[in-house]
């Protein structure tokens, strides 16, 4: 997006895959964008916190005057079978993926609605559509994003707000421990 002139708010709460510690992932993303000639600022608020979500949108408005595009891509995993999962692990994943996406979008929505332009992208997952062992919380959150996208795309259409959902399979540092993650997608045999 930055290569095409978008001015970016890079949001990342930081931390290791298990949520411990601290990282400067948002700062690293900003540095990478700036090194390539783009404009970016960091925000380290949690999308799962309503005020944190508000601060992400407020950062865009303060720095760039508006918000045109929201990419809901925050993620966290707490993979366990449903039987072994705690309700806190359930809530954490639902809050980051589904509620966090709704919160950030909710804060940006009036801005987009008022100016009759906006783009919202949800990053869902094939785990929401097809299911994946040990990911009931994740799959439910990701399928919830599809439902939210379907409804918001209807609500935003008359105001030139396009809402879409990507549902990729993933190979990231968070998915390295997921059963079956060692399959080579280019050579699945």
Language-model regions, residue ranges each:
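Active-site-adjacent segment of SDR/Rossmann-fold oxidoreductases
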Residues: 3-4, 112-114, 130, 146, ...
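Conserved glycine-rich Rossmann-like NAD(P)H-binding loop of the short-chain dehydrogenase/reductase
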Residues: 4-27
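The beta1-alpha1 cofactor-binding region of Rossmann-like NAD(H)/NADP(H)-dependent oxidoreductases
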Residues: 23, 44-58, 87
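A glycine-rich helix->loop->beta "capping" turn
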Residues: 36-39, 59-72, 78-81, 117, ...
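Substrate-binding pocket helix/loop in short-chain dehydrogenase/reductase
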Residues: 81-82, 86-94
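Active-site helix of classical SDR
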Residues: 105, 141
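Residue(s) in the substrate-gating loop at a strand-loop-helix junction
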Residues: 125
């Amino acid at each position: 997006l930055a290569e095409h002139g978008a001015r970016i708010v890079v949001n990342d709460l930081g931390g290791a895959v298990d949520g411990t510690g601290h990282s400067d992932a948002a700062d690293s993303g900003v540095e990478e964008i700036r090194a390539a000639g783009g404009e970016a600022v960091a925000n380290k608020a949690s999308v799962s916190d309503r005020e944190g979500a508000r601060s992400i949108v407020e950062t865009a408005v303060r720095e760039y005057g508006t918000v045109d595009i929201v990419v809901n891509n925050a993620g966290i995993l707490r993979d366990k079978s449903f039987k072994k999962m705690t309700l806190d692990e359930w809530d954490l994943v639902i809050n980051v993926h589904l509620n966090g996406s709704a919160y950030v979008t909710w804060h940006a929505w009036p801005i987009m609605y008022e100016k009759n332009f906006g783009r919202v992208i949800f990053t869902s997952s094939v785990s929401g559509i097809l299911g994946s062992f040990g990911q009931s919380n994740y799959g439910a959150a990701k399928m919830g994003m599809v439902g939210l996208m379907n409804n918001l795309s209807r609500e935003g259409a008359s105001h030139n707000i396009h809402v879409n959902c990507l549902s990729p399979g993933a190979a990231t540092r968070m998915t390295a421990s997921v059963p079956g993650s060692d399959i080579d997608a280019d050579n699945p045999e």
